[in-house]
């Protein structure tokens, strides 16, 4: 309902879906085609797990989006809405993102978590064990993530010959630590 309401405020359903598809192209999502704002089944509505992960990582850069998908509960007057994403309660560092189910696609989940300043996104499609699988995927990603220092600040990378200068060569040094994350 919320997705349809937003679409209505953004020029109507067709205009909003066009904006969604334009943004997908801008983000380089070549295997994504939207037909509705809700993510429910549609004749030509499709994407991939990889592209959903890329879209989620992009969307989480928006503070408002991140706040909404990471909210466990919201009370407005006498009504309390509870987020269906169980990882927000069960997984340390969980920050959202999207749960879903249709008969055609089964249980689909896009999740994200942050630890030690690092964000990881996981996606499963048609997965009946999605909550446990995501906890394992996120755990594995955080456990296998390594940061290697390639050089420290001030390291001489090479000497460059200076023709006609006051010195025959000058040292090129790194301004800050260089790290490789993998």
Model segments located where?
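Substrate-binding clefts and substrate-entry loops adjacent to catalytic sites
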Residues: 1-8, 33-35
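Generic structural marker for isolated residues within well-ordered, non-membrane alpha-helices
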Residues: 3, 20, 84
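Short alpha-helical scaffolding segments that buttress acidic/His motifs in well-ordered protein cores
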Residues: 6-7, 20, 24, 56, ...
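Conserved short loop/turn motifs at secondary-structure junctions
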Residues: 7-10, 37-43
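Alpha-helical structural elements of signaling/regulatory helical domains
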Residues: 12-15, 129
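Short, charged, amphipathic alpha-helices and their helix-cap/turn boundaries
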Residues: 14-32
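Domain-terminus/edge residues, biased toward the C-terminal soluble/receptor-binding domains
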Residues: 29-33, 41-182
């Amino acid at each position: 309902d919320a997705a349809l309401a937003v679409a209505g405020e953004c020029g109507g359903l067709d205009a909003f879906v066009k904006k969604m598809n334009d943004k997908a192209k801008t983000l380089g999502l070549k295997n994504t085609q939207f037909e509705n704002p809700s993510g429910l089944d549609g004749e030509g509505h499709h994407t991939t797990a990889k592209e959903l992960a890329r879209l989620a990582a992009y969307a989480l850069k928006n503070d408002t989006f991140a706040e909404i998908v990471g909210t466990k509960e919201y009370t407005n007057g006498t009504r309390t809405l509870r987020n269906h994403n169980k990882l927000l309660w069960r997984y340390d560092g969980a920050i959202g993102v999207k749960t879903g189910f249709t008969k055609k696609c089964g249980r689909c989940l896009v999740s994200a978590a942050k630890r030690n300043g690092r964000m990881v996104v996981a996606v499963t499609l048609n997965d009946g064990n999605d909550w446990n699988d995501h906890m394992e995927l996120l755990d594995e990603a955080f456990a296998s993530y390594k940061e290697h220092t390639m050089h420290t600040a001030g390291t001489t990378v090479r000497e460059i010959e200076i023709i006609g200068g006051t010195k025959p060569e000058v040292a090129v040094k790194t301004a800050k630590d260089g790290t490789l994350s993998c």
